[in-house]
């Protein structure tokens, strides 16, 4: 490592470093950049013969040897080596600072680790000694409890105080030492920052000096290279000029000799030509005819041979390229297959180890997944409750958005109708009638009938029966609500009244005291509302299920009781009354299970019993109301837990007519009327163009009239001037001025 310093110490030895020969990069070097450069040179040397072969050159056909190289080439090589050495030395000089800083930081870290280790050992020893002293002090407190003499207790307290003071003094001393060490570290940190700033400044100075030296050296070498090229150019010009003069003298001598020989030959040739011309003319005619025929035949054959040659040449070139390509592909495929086989062997070994691990992992995951499955089932039930809650919120938001969009669309339709009315009445002069479409009267989502609650159904039923109670006759058939299984309104009312009378324990005592001064229908309505909330009956479907369950339960009990004797029936009723009064838990549980099973069979058999006539509510005994309610609540709880998704699906609205409704809103103006609007718009545009043209013409006409009046005034002023009377031919005799 070179110590940090300026470039002044390097300048005397710079030429010596540049004059040394640079060794070729080696593949086995420790420097990664040198190894990369060596690989690149090796690849370039391997590709050079192929390039020369493709260009028609040969390695053994070099025209110049190393001795015959030009001065410019030698100068370029020397400049390249010198600049490379300069860059290498400059880079080493700049990086010496970083190396020195790295080594200094390594030494600092080693010293810091040693100091930290000594500090930890010192703290551990201090903890042990202080703990021993503290244990000694605490043990003496136990001894002091056994002493009864005040003087001994006083001496013991003094010694304990001395020991405690010594312990605190040791702790304070340790704290002061650590604080002093912290202060020295802060000072050292400030010194390090200053040292780093000095190193950075030194690095910048060296970099600037290196840039200046490199720029200076580059300029000098560029000047030397240009000078070498100029000297070589002058030498080439002088040598070529001498060669050209010698060649020109030889050429002139040869031309003179050729001219004398030619003159002699011309005389001989003229004599021979005269003799030969006559004989050649005759022979020429015969040979010409024959040769023309041969030439035509040979030209045809030549064209055929050329076509065959061109075709064969293209085939051979194509086959050669295909063979080369296949050879390269085969070598690549072989190497790929070898690598693939090795990789697959490694993958096979890894898969075997993974297979053994995954068997254990899957066994553990199976146990964890069973626990997760149970947990997810509970979460799924909670999610179903949340889905029902958010479904109601989404329905409310959907209705609000629907009403907002519907109001906006209807405002646009009203504006369109106003425009149509103005067009018909003002522009066309035709009577206009407002269209009456079915979708203009719609408000809110289509086919969305909100389900009524059980309390609303009961309220409507009580009001309906109160109004029609006087009009009904005994001989007339019962009126029916829109209930399943064609249950009459009167039957439903009787069942609900019976339920209200027998289920008073489900109502709070405070509510019962508040219901006393109310009317009968209002009292029944509030009592049934409290009972429904206690039983979990919320919707219209739950109310219908309750009524049907009462009727079917009674029908099932009647069919089973026909097979039992009257005496056993009386004893069973007495036993049931005693059991209900005693509250036997065992028999009540068995009875509940039987009734739940009956309720399930009744629910499953609803579709088969649609055509059966419901029994009369007067056959239901008041003592059976509680049993029926208990069985109904247990049967209602199970379907709600297991069939929550179908219930959400059932409450979903039918959106099949939404697109038809919104499409109808867009077609309130038919295409024929839109065509009428387009034609009227075109006509009004033409009318507007005519009006604008007329306005322009009126402006031009007014301007022309103004100019005309001005010209007439000037002419009149000219004619009325006194100078006209002095003229021999006054203008009034030539011009005939019109009078206003």
Curated annotation (Swiss-Prot):
Family to which this protein belongs: Belongs to the DRC1 family.
GO cellular component, as recorded: axonemal dynein complex; axoneme; motile cilium
Stretches with biased composition (Basic and acidic residues): 595-605
Coiled-coil positions: 101-387, 691-724
Keyword tags: Cell projection, Cilium, Coiled coil, Cytoplasm, Cytoskeleton, Flagellum
Protein name: Dynein regulatory complex protein 1
Pfam families: NYD-SP28, NYD-SP28_assoc
GO biological process terms, semicolon-separated: axonemal dynein complex assembly; cilium-dependent cell motility; regulation of cilium movement
Gene coding for it: DRC1
InterPro entries the UniProt entry points to: DRC1/2_N, DRC1/DRC2, DRC1_C
Keyword Transmembrane among UniProt keywords: no
Function in brief: Component of the nexin-dynein regulatory complex (N-DRC) a key regulator of ciliary/flagellar motility which maintains the alignment and integrity of the distal axoneme and regulates microtubule sliding in motile axonemes. Plays a critical role in the assembly of N-DRC and also stabilizes the assembly of multiple inner dynein arms and radial spokes. Coassembles with CCDC65/DRC2 to form a central scaffold needed for assembly of the N-DRC and its attachment to the outer doublet microtubules.
Assembly and oligomerization: Component of the nexin-dynein regulatory complex (N-DRC). Interacts with CCDC65/DRC2, DRC3, GAS8/DRC4 and TCTE1/DRC5.
UniProt region (Disordered), positions on chain: 56-75, 573-620
Compartments, as annotated in UniProt: Cytoplasm, Cytoskeleton, Cilium axoneme; Cytoplasm, Cytoskeleton, Flagellum axoneme
